[in-house]
């Protein structure tokens, strides 16, 4: 028996743990998953944004492919979920405003299930202003509303 454990969240979700799982499957080793903590689920539920259909994007590419990915998501109507570092949060939200429109609804959750848990909701403009005035810290989940059908 082998257990795959992550120090933050569910193994294989925005984590290279899927490589271990893939090798187990390829080698006929049975894999069972126990339900556990995944930051994006409480962030999605508490966002106030539609959660009947969503797409999980995880961490965006840092350089190569980042703008291509954002362009490919411009027409996405489902709620989108991203993980981000506190050091890149304002830059990422600013890029979201450029690609998706400054009035797009967003919820930024940090430190989920910890003593300093915080959710900031509003338009991209409002949330950018909040984090320009209040330095973000901790593990961050961004929940971005999808494009509204005209």
Which functions belong to the PLM regions below?
Residues 79, 83-150:
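A contiguous loop/helix-start segment that scaffolds small-molecule binding in enzyme catalytic cores
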Residues 15, 43-45, 67-68, 92-94, ...:
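Short, well-ordered secondary-structure micro-motifs
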Residues 2-9, 13, 80-84:
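Acidic beta-strand-to-loop metal/phosphate-binding motif
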Residues 10-13, 62-63, 116:
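Short, small-residue-enriched loops and turns at beta-alpha junctions
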Residues 19-76:
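Class I SAM-dependent methyltransferase SAM-binding "motif I" and its flanking Rossmann-like core
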Residues 3-7, 53, 107-111:
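Short beta-strands and strand-loop turn motifs
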Residues 11, 38-41, 114-115:
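Short gly/pro/ser/thr-enriched loop/turn and capping motifs at secondary-structure boundaries
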Residues 6, 33-36, 82, 108:
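General beta-strand structural signal in soluble alpha/beta enzymes
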